[in-house]
Amino acid sequence: MTQKTRTRFAPSPTGFIHLGNIRSALYPWAFARSTGGDFILRIEDTDLDRSTQAAVDVIIESMSWLGLDYDEGPFYQMQRMDRYKTVLAELQAAGHVYPCYMSVAELDALRDAQMAAKEKPRYDGTWRPAPGKTLPPIPEGVKPVLRFKNPLGGSVVWDDKVKGRIEISNDELDDLVIARPDGTPTYNFCVVVDDLDMAITHVIRGDDHVNNTPRQINIFKALGQEPPVYAHLPTVLNEQGEKMSKRNGAKPVTQYRDEGYLPDAMVNYLARLGWSHGDDEIFSRAQFLQWFNLDHLGRSAAQFDEAKLRWVNAQHLKIMSDDALAPLVQAQLQKRGIQADERLPRICALFKDRCDTTVVLADWAAAFYADITLNPAEVSQHVTDAIKPALNLLSEKLASCSWDKLSIAAAIKEVLVACAIKMPLLAMPVRVLVMGSAHTPSLDAVLELCEREKVLTRLRSE
């Protein structure tokens, strides 16, 4: 019987979550969904000085907005301390763990000496017990750390689903601290216990964790367990070619929501930051899940490009249904104190092809519900004294005609004939006065969606 796929996203709640972080949630989520497996959310909150509940809330909010639903969790490492200590005691009883009383000053001196000798800094095993070895006397009043007995000799080998075969000599790995002097277990140990208890089959994470993997595999084997399959994702770079990080100006995921990006567009764009399906650039969430597999994950670093993200978002705006789009535009309008009405889906249909975010679409929609600010340069260019008689005549005809697209188009045509002018000469000033811009969709369609009194008031404003 094939084992059910179980993946996880295990962020540390030490600040906001950016696109590089959330991509590490997207791929394990997609792999679980595409294989009928489970996706688990685990909060690695053992850094008590930096972890906050507010950061946890933002992680969950960001995942919810993007539709990255999880089947189990969130599990919190700080709530699992008793379990870690139980497993730690088992390792200690089996002889895989030993106390180390080396002070920070001694460790610093060792590191300095190794660096002076141009050696790789590493713990030298002073307190590691061995047959026939005499350990130093235990210092009084010193609480030891607990170190894991890394195997001597041999190598750690795994078939990484992104990077291929990786082999690390055990001689490169020193004896890892797995419990602090106060008994609190450390990151690499907690991760192994969590992945075992949660039956994780595939660990899909950033390649900044590659160096942790051989240490974790050795702990798995000391516990008599097989490690999961690993896939280490290449780094996401910012537009300057640096690793995306908070320090390098990365924005919170939720800021993209506020700036008018669509969840499906974000998933589409993020999916392409390290994975591909032929030349397909625009695809639905369902298509992504149908196509996704670990074999198509790229090995090279992926560079974020906000202009490309806006283009992807524009494509998704075009194909999104107007009824689904309207509430998102309404949310943007509400931030401006504007309440839309039943016309909003039709407004979305009329303007969405010229927009790349819901904020830009809301800019257009706002003109139908709130006062507009005229552009003096456009007014000066298009609303000339010569065209004002035609504008006055149009106002008269629009005041008495039926308020539908055909009747409005007929009124405009009557003015063009009566004044012997071409359409652009009339349409441009009408657009400027009614919508605040000389460039809009079809004039009769725009006027039909605008209230008659609003149109007449704006036409008579100059």
From Swiss-Prot:
GO BP annotation list: glutamyl-tRNA aminoacylation
Substrates-to-products reaction catalysed: tRNA(Glu) + L-glutamate + ATP = L-glutamyl-tRNA(Glu) + AMP + diphosphate
InterPro entries documented for this protein: aa-tRNA-synth_I_cd-bd, aa-tRNA-synth_I_codon-bd_sub2, aa-tRNA-synth_I_CS, aa_tRNA-synth_I_cd-bd_sf, Glu-tRNA-ligase_bac/mito, Glu/Gln-tRNA-synth, Glu/Gln-tRNA-synth_Ib_cat-dom, GluQ/Sye
Binding site for ATP: K246
Molecular function terms from GO: ATP binding; glutamate-tRNA ligase activity; tRNA binding; zinc ion binding
Residue pairs linked by disulfide bridges in the UniProt entry: none
A single Gene Ontology CC term: cytosol
Pfam families the record matches: Anticodon_2, tRNA-synt_1c
Gene3D superfamilies tied to this protein: 1.10.10.350, HUPs
Top-rank taxon: Bacteria
Subcellular location field: Cytoplasm
HAMAP family (UniProt xref): Glu_tRNA_synth_type1 (MF_00022)
Subunit-level organization: Monomer.
Family, as annotated: Belongs to the class-I aminoacyl-tRNA synthetase family. Glutamate--tRNA ligase type 1 subfamily.
Biological function: Catalyzes the attachment of glutamate to tRNA(Glu) in a two-step reaction: glutamate is first activated by ATP to form Glu-AMP and then transferred to the acceptor end of tRNA(Glu).
Protein name, per record: Glutamate--tRNA ligase
Upper taxonomic lineage: Bacteria, Pseudomonadati, Pseudomonadota, Betaproteobacteria, Burkholderiales
